[in-house]
Amino acid sequence: MLPADICWAVRPSSTAAYTTRLVVYRPSDPANFNGTVVVEWLDASGGADVSADWIKVHIELIRNGFAWVGVSAQAVGVEGPIVGTNASGPIGGSKAIDPARYASLDHPGDSYSYDIFSQAGLAVRHRNGPDPLAGLQTRRVIAVGYPQSADRIATHVNSMQPLAHIFDGFLVHSRSLAAGNLSDGPQPVAVPNPWFLLAADAKNLESAATHSAIGIAR
């Protein structure tokens, strides 16, 4: 993992074609749109895309005229296998859950995830191709992610944003001590000093409730 609070010198590497998924909620009446688009890096830590922040704040976003775009930025959310089931059905990557609907999706790997997320931000700000917002006039674009996705957003803030300036603001929601890796390749490890990871009480309570819900003994 990379240190979370340093601006890094980055450069382009290889290129790859991709097709991913955007999930969009927007006001049906343009008069109700407040001009702000929230772009969420969908959390794929459980083997499937989860709109963690949308779940927590969607009532507020709808009530106040925001648009929300969920981005399948990571490979496992697109290409991953079925990892379980719940009341709604199977859990896993989009192509495994619904092969017919998502047959055209193609993710080249997480080394490209930051650029995929950046291009999703550009798609809602400067719409030169298909328009995910159906003509709504965007004034602000905010990137959000929770919690594994927050690590990725932290990396985006420190590496991509200084170069591309795509987003107007960021919500880095409950990240870990470090930031997300920049590529799929081997990562340097350097921990010269002892360190502590402090989680707020609310996070601990949330974790306990989750473990209880899925039957993990504590």
Please describe what each predicted stretch is.
Residues 1-218:
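C-terminal His-loop and adjacent cap/lid subdomain of alpha/beta-hydrolase
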